[in-house]
């Protein structure tokens, strides 16, 4: 018997990702990127819920079921409203009782 996973709504996934970003950015981003983010976030900052990519296995070394995870990006958007400077990509489990996440930080 398969149990249905209640998926995160986009706003909740965004909140979780942004909270993790704020908590961990200082340890994982270059100081210049942190400064850039802080200076420009009010004007150009974005936290976007995106379609879960199929290349996470390459990034984290674990095969994932795209239906069980939400993907959120944190970064800066350009004049065309496209996120062109991604500081972190989050993969967040929809499972509330076992909320795991993976992060790919800007290098």
UniProtKB/Swiss-Prot annotation:
Source domain of life: Bacteria
Pfam families: DUF440
InterPro entries: dsDNA_mimic_put, Put_dsDNA_mimic_sf
Residue stretches spanning the membrane: none
Similarity remark: Belongs to the putative dsDNA mimic protein family.
Role of this protein: May act as a double-stranded DNA (dsDNA) mimic. Probably regulates the activity of a dsDNA-binding protein.
NCBIfam families: PRK05094.1
Name of the protein described by the UniProt record: Putative double-stranded DNA mimic protein CGSHiGG_01135
Source species of the chain: Haemophilus influenzae (strain PittGG)
